[in-house]
Amino acid sequence: MSHRHQLKAALLVALLAFMGMAFSSAAQTNASPRQPLRLEEVLGSITNQYPPLLAALIERDITAGRLKSAQGTFDFNTFARVFGMPAGYYETATVDTGFEQFLGLWGSTVFGGYRITGGDLLPDYDKTRTQGGGELRFGLKVPLLRDGSIDRRRAAVLKAGLDKELADPVIARQQLDFIRAGTVGYVNWLGAGERWRLAERLLSIANDRHNAISNQVQAGLVGRIVLTDNLRLVVSREIFLVQAQRRFEAAALALSLFYRNTSDEPVIAARERLPDTFPMMTAPDGIQLDRDLQLAVAKRPEVRQIRLALDKLEVDRRLAQNQMLPNLDVGAFASQNFGKDRYPDLNEFELQLGVEFRMPLQRREARGRLTELEGQIQQVTNQERFARNRIHTEVRDTFSALLAAHQQIQQAQLNVELAEELRSAEEEKFRRGGSDLLPLQLREQAAFDAQLLTVEARTEYLRALADYRAATATDLAARGPLPAR
């Protein structure tokens, strides 16, 4: 029976060693020099190499492309055409070139061109005829009411510009989420590593005692059942060690999604890169909470995102209000012929002025659009107010969680001190023969559980700190602007 248990224990230890060697080899393949891995290194990797964040940065290029496309409404347009009658009573050919430029200044448009007609003399009613040197023309059209202060083309440019600004808070929101997730991944890796260390220490205690009990059994001081009981304890602690190692490996793999090398490949952080201790954990400052409540609304990207959405709706509302007005357009057109006088009626400088008025009587399209936009603006305004309330709530809630986590650390440390005192007393009593193995095992397990609670309390504090920093958008200001893609 004892030999069978010893064989199982040996196999379990061999399996554990093989798993550790395999994982360590994979980690060594990817890891950087054996310096402790710090959170700042992980966050730097997220900022510069995390694929989802790099993909989010492309939104800047997308919105810049949309803005440039919208600005195409201000492109300088030119045209050229040739037409004629090669056969017929009048054999003529005409070359006509011109340009048109939308200025954007109160919706005005300038246009002009040059035309020349050659061939047989044309009758007076032919509008394409020119003198021998051709005709220069120039014109201007200005909308006085509708499409004056704003029109669909200028509204599209304004909204595309706002979309370009909107890319930054959208990216910043994702950056906050990625930083928080990467921080939690790092904290879980720290906690899993500390659990692994504790499991090894607990197993080492049982192994050392196993050797001592074996000597006592051989000397006839204790029964073999005591050795069997301790062997059972060794096996159970080896099982826990395997579980702790697997937990660490899972945490390292999860962290590797955020932590990458210069080739943008995931790095599996080896156990050797674990820091000796957890980061310093200070008590939350209630005065800082008051400051953070004020700053969070200003720094959180959701508020700016909603404000920009409101600005876009305001552009649409301005356009809808303008579309309620009638069309009242004025224009001027001037032309002058040059060269050989073939037509006596085309010698003079010509200037044409005109006014055009148009208006749909019901104006239902503009009225309906205006009603729709006013409703949407009210919706987004309510969303903005709720977003501010939610930000305040999140900051207070995460601060409360941070405060509770810090208090748990203090209580957990006291729990460890008391459990260690009891374990030490029970161990001394066992050495003197005043106690058997079972009470000592219970004291050791209680001390181990207390240490695990401390690890959990510390990791919970760091997770709560990550939540608080995300709620207050602290990492956005701390890390500065994102790099260009």
Q: Can you say where each PLM-predicted feature lies in the sequence?
A:
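Periplasmic alpha-helical coiled-coil/stalk elements that build and connect Gram-negative outer-membrane
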Residues: 2, 9, 168-292, 401, ...
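Gram-negative outer-membrane assembly/targeting C-terminal domains
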Residues: 28, 463-485
